[in-house]
């Protein structure tokens, strides 16, 4: 029973995250298939005003063709919150 509830919660979270993906982020995410980052939530704000779950994920995104073309880099620790 607990496993079903947990699985349902994870499924709902994945659907919500998929619906919030922007076109530029979708390009970067589709290029990041080979990255292996730990599932640690320590958000960082990037130069594209997107929050990444941790520095490893941001580094991975910055090394994609799209990330390199836009000069993706860390701006600050924490979520972006639409600050710029």
From Swiss-Prot:
GO terms (BP aspect): suppression of blood coagulation in another organism
Protein purpose: Functions as a slow and tight inhibitor of host neutrophil elastase (ELANE). Inhibits host proteinase 3 (PRTN3) and chymotrypsin. Does not inhibit other host proteases involved in coagulation or inflammation, such as cathepsin G (CTSG), trypsin, chymase, matriptase, beta-tryptase, kallikrein, urokinase-type plasminogen activator (PLAU), coagulation factors Xa (F10), XIa (F11), XIIa (F12), plasmin (PLG), thrombin (F2) and tissue-type plasminogen activator (PLAT). Inhibits host neutrophil chemotaxis induced by N-formylmethionine-leucyl-phenylalanine (fMLP) in vitro.
InterPro entries per record: Kazal_dom (IPR002350), Kazal_dom_sf (IPR036058), Serpin (IPR053265)
Protein's name in the database: Agaphelin
Organism: Anopheles gambiae (African malaria mosquito)
Additional comment: Reduces inflammation and neutrophil accumulation in a mouse model of acute inflammation. Prevents thrombus formation in FeCl(3)-induced carotid artery thrombosis model in mice without impairing hemostasis. Protects mice from experimental ischemic stroke by reducing local thrombus formation, blood-brain barrier damage and inflammatory responses in brain.
GO molecular function: peptidase inhibitor activity; serine-type endopeptidase inhibitor activity; toxin activity
Pfam families: Kazal_1 (PF00050)
Limits of the Kazal-like domain: 29-82
GO cellular component: extracellular region
Signal peptide: 1-26
CDD domains assigned: KAZAL_FS
Localization terms from the record: Secreted
Induction and repression of expression: (Microbial infection) Up-regulated in salivary gland following infection with Plasmodium falciparum.
Entry keyword set: Blood coagulation cascade inhibiting toxin, Disulfide bond, Glycoprotein, Hemostasis impairing toxin, Platelet aggregation inhibiting toxin, Protease inhibitor, Secreted, Serine protease inhibitor, Signal, Toxin
Subunit relationships: Interacts with human ELANE.
Glycosylation sites: 49
Annotated site, Reactive bond, chain positions: 39-40
Disulphide linkage map: 35-60, 37-56, 45-80
KW Transmembrane helix (keyword) present: no
């Amino acid at each position: 029973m607990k496993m079903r509830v947990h699985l349902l919660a994870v499924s709902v979270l994945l659907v919500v995250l998929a619906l919030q993906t922007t076109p530029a982020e979708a390009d970067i995410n589709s290029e990041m298939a080979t990255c292996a980052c730990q599932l640690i939530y320590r958000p960082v704000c990037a130069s594209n005003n997107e929050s990444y779950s941790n520095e490893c994920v941001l580094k991975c995104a910055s090394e994609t063709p799209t990330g390199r073309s836009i000069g993706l880099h860390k701006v600050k620790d924490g979520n972006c919150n639409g600050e710029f």
